[in-house]
Amino acid sequence: NLFNGEYYEHEVRTPRRTRDMAPSLRLHMGAAKVMQPDYQLGNGCLVDQLVGQFMAHVCGLGYLVKPSHVRRTLRSITKYNRRDGFIDHFNCMRSYAMGDESALLLASYPRGRPDNPFPYFTEVMTGFEYTAAIGMLYEGQDAAGLRAIDDIRSRYDGAKRSPFDEA
C-alpha cells in the first residue's frame, strides 16, 4: 500500500543486481547509481497523483482506491503543494508562476526531500493543476478546487499571460 496516511508515495524499487537492468535504461537521468537512483519522486506529494482516479470518474468507473484516501490525498495536495506567492520561491527550471501569484506546485516534500529530487518539483503547470482541481470538485472540495482554477485564470488573464497559451 503506497498510501502513507496523507497521500500516495512513490516507492522506488531498484533491481536486485545492476546487471538485471537493461543497459539502455542505465544511460540518463540519475541512472549512474542504479541502486540509489537520483531524480525520483520518492516520498513527495505529487500534484497529479490521482490522475487515474480523475479519469475513472470522468469515464464513470467509480473509485479505484478507497474514497477516504482520495479525499485525504486531495486535502494534502492543497495543504502541501499550494503556494501563495513566488517572490522567494527558488525554481531552477521553468517559471510559470511568479511574484504574488498563487499555484499548485508539481510536488512538495513535507516528509523530507531527497538529495537529488524529482527535477520538476518546484514548477507549476496548469494541466496538472486542473487535474487536481477537477478531482477536488468531484470529491466535494469545491472551495479548494475553484481556488486552484481561479489561480490559473488569474495567471493567464490576458494581461500577464495569454489566456490561449496556458503552460
Question: Residue locations for each model-derived region?
Answer:
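Catalytic cores of secreted or luminal carbohydrate-active enzymes
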Residues: 167
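Extended glycan-interaction surfaces of carbohydrate-active proteins
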Residues: 1-125, 147-164
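Alpha-helical support elements that line or immediately flank enzyme active sites
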Residues: 53, 57-63, 129-142
